[in-house]
Curated annotation (Swiss-Prot):
GO biological process assignments: glucose metabolic process; NADPH regeneration; pentose-phosphate shunt, oxidative branch; response to hydrogen peroxide
Example of a GO cellular component annotation carried by this entry: cytoplasm
Residues recorded with modification N-acetylserine: 2
Family to which this protein belongs: Belongs to the glucose-6-phosphate dehydrogenase family.
Residue ranges crossing the lipid bilayer per the database entry: none
Residues that bear Phosphotyrosine: 145
Protein name: Glucose-6-phosphate 1-dehydrogenase
Reaction equation(s) it catalyzes: D-glucose 6-phosphate + NADP(+) = 6-phospho-D-glucono-1,5-lactone + NADPH + H(+)
Gene ablation phenotype (knockout): Shows growth defects in acetate-supplemented medium; the phenotype is enhanced by addition of hydrogen peroxide (increased oxidative stress) and/or double knockout of ZWF1 and YHM2. Decreases the cytosolic NADPH/NADP(+) ratio; this effect is enhanced in the presence of hydrogen peroxide. Ribitol-5P absent from cell. Decreases cellular levels of ribose-5P and ribulose-5P. Decreases cytosolic levels of citrate and oxoglutarate in the presence of hydrogen peroxide. Double knockouts of ZWF1 and YHM2 show an increased mitochondrial NADPH/NADP(+) ratio in the presence of hydrogen peroxide.
Active-site residue numbers: 249 (proton acceptor)
Protein residues bound to NADP(+) 1: 18-25, 52, 157
NCBIfam families documented for this protein: zwf
């Protein structure tokens, strides 16, 4: 029986490429500190930041990162901050020349020698734009790869621009790293409620038994952002909302929602089932997609997407999209799975909504459908909307809920941030929450025909919707077309998803 993956614990070397960038400043270094603060990153770990910017460690890198470090224990965490920065060194170097990487190798080997490391454990985090990713990967392999140890490489999205570019990237990476050395990170897989999906589904018989076409009428996966591109239009214009969040984040949620029970919770069993369900996804109907682009707010205070100076005034970039997936297998055939995502909407949230079929007619002439709602962010919660008799002498019914609100139920728990979870998983050698090469290939195969349809010269023109609205006017009709029953007739008090002043007894 083979042993599990090697855990990186004492005297691990972590190198963060792109250390001067926003991702490293706001996510990578704060995640490393969070793990250290909570005792999940050994103090013997050595962290190297590497970037082209000529920064000093004390005045520049530290001052950039410090405002983003969370200190839940107040002043008690100040000493942890100082200890953490003593673990960090910074190296300035180009990505396409050897000198900087030679210096990094020298510093790594010096540390490992002083720590009497026999089998090097090296984790490389590529917080880099796609344009330099392959260049750095080649330098890692030729200059700092642990030939007599274990190397792991965390890769940030985007993993390609379409199916052809993703395959080209995989082709170029193949000679450099084994699949088990690569950790393609999608941070949504580290979010607490996304990680909880398999337990909710398969650890509760009443949910597991009803999670199928016999009981569920429709499924929605929604991503809403209150803000627009805010000066990033030039970058977003070549990406669009589909590549930004749907081909990756939301599709990952969909696979966990719809996959079959794995034979075990080991990484490959989970990823095998994700691949199986992706293979059952029917091609997207390009004529059954709702596309939008935000215009000015109705009061004129917020600009339109094309008002961004970095965006072409004739841009047809999609900032809102809604589409429906059909999974051709025994569990899901006939159940529309709607995915929608947009910027500059009326609120910011990510949620999953499973609407159950209506009860048989008879004593109940007009009663709402049950819904299971999983709020990923903000204010993580799970609640089941169901019908109950209104208190009193009447036999009237009302919609109420059973709800699990994380902020009140788990007040005394440390709930790690997504990047903390995933970096920890990489250190442990756990691939469960990372994207495998065949999974990536199939996901691009699903979306690339739609992207080509949208981006051809005579492609569809997105519907303009006001900044701060719910999205294109056709959204309600689109949802109803795909079997979602609007609950407009039935008043409902949404559960409180923020901690209250008093704890439950």
């Amino acid at each position: 029986m083979s042993e599990g993956p090697v855990k990186f614990e004492k005297n691990t070397v972590i190198s963060v490429f792109g250390a001067s960038g926003d991702l490293a400043k706001k996510k990578t270094f704060p995640a490393l500190f969070g793990l250290f603060r909570e005792g999940y990153l050994d103090p013997s770990t050595k962290i190297f930041g590497y970037a082209r910017s000529k920064l000093s460690m004390e005045e520049d890198l530290k001052s950039r990162v410090l405002p983003h470090l969370k200190k839940p224990h107040g002043e008690a965490d100040d000493s942890k901050v100082e200890q953490f920065f003593k673990m960090v060194s910074y190296i300035s170097g180009n990505y396409d020349t050897d000198e900087g990487f030679d210096e990094l190798r020298t510093q790594i080997e010096k540390f490992e020698k002083s720590a009497n490391v026999d089998v090097p454990h090296r984790l490389f985090y590529l917080a880099l734009p796609p344009s330099v990713f392959l260049t750095v990967a080649k330098q890692i392999k030729s200059r700092v790869y642990a030939e007599n140890g274990i190397t792991r490489v965390i890769v940030e999205k985007p993993f390609g621009h379409d199916l052809a570019s993703a395959r080209e990237l995989q082709k170029n990476l193949g000679p450099l790293f084994k699949e088990e050395e690569l950790y393609r990170i999608d941070h949504y897989l580290g979010k607490e409620l996304v990680k909880n999906l398999l337990v909710l589904r398969f650890g509760n018989q009443f949910l597991n038994a009803s999670w199928n076409r016999d009981n569920i009428q429709s499924v929605q996966i929604s991503f809403k952002e209150r803000f627009g591109t805010e000066g990033r239009g030039g970058y977003f214009d070549s990406i669009g909302i589909i590549r930004d969040v749907m081909q990756n984040h939301l599709l990952q949620i969909m696979t966990l929602l719809t996959m079959e029970r794995p034979v075990s919770f080991d990484p490959e069993s989970i990823r095998d089932e994700k691949v199986k369900v992706l293979k059952a996804v029917a091609p997207i109907d390009t004529d059954d997609v709702l596309l939008g682009q935000y215009g000015k707010s109705e009061d004129g205070s917020k600009p339109a997407y094309v008002d961004d100076d970095t965006v072409d005034k004739d841009s047809k970039c999609v900032t809102f999209a809604a589409m429906t997936f059909n999974i051709e297998n025994e569990r899901w055939e006939g159940v529309p799975i709607m995915m929608r995502a947009g910027k500059a909407l009326n609120e910011s949230k990510v949620e999953i909504r499973l609407q159950y079929k209506a009860v048989a007619s008879g004593v109940f002439k007009d009663i709402p459908n049950n819904e299971l709602v999983i709020r990923v962010q903000p204010d993580a919660a799970v609640y089941l909307k169901f019908n109950a008799k209104t208190p009193g002498l009447s036999n009237a019914t009302q919609v109420t809920d059973l709800n699990l609100t994380y902020a009140s139920r788990y007040q005394d728990f440390w709930i790690p941030e997504a990047y903390e979870v995933l970096i920890r998983d990489a250190l442990l050698g756990d691939h469960s929450n990372f994207v495998r090469d065949d999974e990536l290939d199939i996901s691009w195969g699903i979306f690339t025909p739609l992207l080509k349809h949208i981006e051809r010269p005579d492609g569809p023109t997105p519907e303009i919707y006001p900044y701060g609205s719910r999205g294109p006017k056709g959204l309600k009709e689109y949802m109803q077309k795909h079997k979602y029953v609007m609950p407009e007739k039935h008043p409902y008090a949404w559960p409180v998803t923020k901690p209250e002043d008093t704890k439950d007894n």
